[in-house]
Amino acid sequence: MSKLSPALKQLINAAHSRPGPVPAPPRIQAVYQRIQEEATERKLGRPSWLGISTAATMTMNSPESMIALYNSTSASRPENESVQIAEFMREIGLKCIGFNGIPRTINMLNAFRASLPPTIASSLNTTPTRSPSPQNILDTNTRGRALWDAIYRPLETKLIDKLGDAHPDLPVFIINQEYGGLFTDPPGKPGAKVGRVTTSLVAITCLRAQQGVGPQVLSHVFGLRKGWEDGTWKEEPEAGSEEAIRWLVSDEGCTWVLEKVDELVEALGGGAGTLSPAIDEKPKELTTTKTMSLINRVRDLATNDEHTRWMIPLLLVVDAALCGVVIEKIPYTEIDWTTYMQHIALIIKGERDYTKITGSTGPLVYPGAHVWIYKQLFKITDEGRDIQRAQYIFALVYLGTLALVFQCYRKARVPPYVFPLLILSKRLHSIFLLRCFNDCFAVLGLFAALFCYQRDQWHVGSFLFATGLNVKMSLLLPLPAMGVLMIMKLGSREAMTHAMIIFQTTVLFGYPFRKAAFSYFGRAFELSRQFTYKWTVNWRFVSEETFLSKPFALGLLSVHVTLLITFFLTRWIKPSKRTPKQFLKIIMPQAEPRDQDTMALRITPNLHT
């Protein structure tokens, strides 16, 4: 009777009886890294994001992913900090018993310790901290009841009665053993501690990952919010700053938590919670490179933004080769290059009056940054005669701009299928490589500014934007949207500082023309200038008479203003959670609004683009 028959062993270990440990998918570290980056942007501390990732991995039963999470978190950390990380993850795993059960937790924690580097494993705490005794049993039960009441008030007593109807010992076990003995840390406990905020995040994560327990998830979402309301979040300052926790308990923050858990479940289990399949169901295939169907591979390649890590350099190399082919095989188109060089030649001779600086296709109508850039090109290209050298310089400008655009799109989580489209634009290659327009440097300045804004480098970004604006005035077009975002992100007073940076940079680039300042600003920033029909592309379908008419110009201006107002009302001010009238009041307030920090947290990289 001590041995089992082969048939019985086979039945016990059958794949359909219960899914086994989940191998680490190839992209799981990238998912962990993204969650960490997003949490850090929101000023959430390590306990918050590491607690979510650890709890989801424990629930999905993936020991390999657990050690991958540890490795990515502890990389380049000193040994003592790596020990703290391992202790914390182990403590999170222990709390998962209350949601995932004992057997799975045993297997996961054993596998986790066995995979740790020997020096880390040997440094882990080996002394129990939750041993019951006559001296601490009352305190443990009191802690459990206090946590229960804090989470479920004002329904705490009704829930106890309801649980007691199911089984009289059920509320006793849950409150005393789970909430008191497990979910709360004993006083004076050495090593890793898991506070109220992180415990709620663990509960939400485990239950969400299991699926099928929506009411319990809802209860712990409310429990997380009550931790903010009663101030117990302050007992765990490592979880995040005040503004970060305020955001975390908001609708937006809770949505973020649930979405991150869903991403982990999708990555680790193909979207199925591991505790939910029916007994006769075969587990779904893991979304790994080896097992995915061709359709799933294509879908993953098109929508999983982690692929942009390798896609961006590949596309840049391909486009660099394409640029070479375009320059060598397609004739250069002369439109403004010669005129630019004629302008620069006059400036080098000492002319500073914009009304006297003219060339083959017209007068100089661009600001000082344009002059400075093309003065350098004048020197490098033998006074503009070496066109091919200029084309290769513009190819470098194009590739640099494209790299910035890629990074801005990647930061905004644009899906990968969009990226190849960026290198297929015939018009972009024409503008940069075949015509050498100054639009190239203006766009470079714009996307360099967006790159900085997305990374909270606002002062540098405003200088770069001002530089692009002083190449070509077309950069005034995105300025209204940028102003609204700055007010919400930085506050109206700091937004005024950035307006001054843009103004002062404009004055700086105009300094060489200070003796003819009126002609400089009149020509370089002339808003009433009428464009020549010959050079239009987008309005070629209308007649020249219509294009040059005043009603047509006023009509376009009206449409533009209408679109600005529409975007202002329907999209730009959304993060402020204000009506248009209320928003206008914060533009010039006597003091910053109370919710400025919360409003600022809603300005994310995807809004910048």
From Swiss-Prot:
Residues that span the membrane, as ranges: 389-409, 431-451, 468-488, 550-570
Gene Ontology biological process terms from the UniProt entry: protein glycosylation
Topology of the protein relative to the lipid bilayer: Multi-pass membrane protein
Superkingdom assignment: Eukaryota
Enzymatic class: transferase
GO molecular function: dol-P-Man:Man(5)GlcNAc(2)-PP-Dol alpha-1,3-mannosyltransferase activity
Keyword Repressor: no
Topology Lumenal: residue spans: 1-388, 452-467, 571-609
Cytoplasmic face residues: 410-430, 489-549
InterPro entries the record matches: AhpD-like, Glycosyltransferase_ALG3
Any one Pfam family match given in the protein's UniProt record, by short name: ALG3
Keyword terms of this UniProt record: Endoplasmic reticulum, Glycosyltransferase, Membrane, Transferase, Transmembrane, Transmembrane helix
Record's subcellular location: Endoplasmic reticulum membrane
UniProt GO cellular component terms: endoplasmic reticulum; endoplasmic reticulum membrane
Transferase recorded as keyword: yes
EC number(s) per entry: 2.4.1.258
Pathway per the UniProt entry: Protein modification; protein glycosylation
Recorded catalytic activity of this chain's protein: an alpha-D-Man-(1->2)-alpha-D-Man-(1->2)-alpha-D-Man-(1->3)-[alpha-D-Man-(1->6)]-beta-D-Man-(1->4)-beta-D-GlcNAc-(1->4)-alpha-D-GlcNAc-diphospho-di-trans,poly-cis-dolichol + a di-trans,poly-cis-dolichyl beta-D-mannosyl phosphate = an alpha-D-Man-(1->2)-alpha-D-Man-(1->2)-alpha-D-Man-(1->3)-[alpha-D-Man-(1->3)-alpha-D-Man-(1->6)]-beta-D-Man-(1->4)-beta-D-GlcNAc-(1->4)-alpha-D-GlcNAc-diphospho-di-trans,poly-cis-dolichol + a di-trans,poly-cis-dolichyl phosphate + H(+)
Similarity comment: family membership: Belongs to the glycosyltransferase ALG3 family.
Function of the protein: Dol-P-Man:Man(5)GlcNAc(2)-PP-Dol alpha-1,3-mannosyltransferase that operates in the biosynthetic pathway of dolichol-linked oligosaccharides, the glycan precursors employed in protein asparagine (N)-glycosylation. The assembly of dolichol-linked oligosaccharides begins on the cytosolic side of the endoplasmic reticulum membrane and finishes in its lumen. The sequential addition of sugars to dolichol pyrophosphate produces dolichol-linked oligosaccharides containing fourteen sugars, including two GlcNAcs, nine mannoses and three glucoses.
Protein name: Dol-P-Man:Man(5)GlcNAc(2)-PP-Dol alpha-1,3-mannosyltransferase
Gene source species: Phaeosphaeria nodorum (strain SN15 / ATCC MYA-4574 / FGSC 10173) (Glume blotch fungus)
Gene name as annotated: ALG3
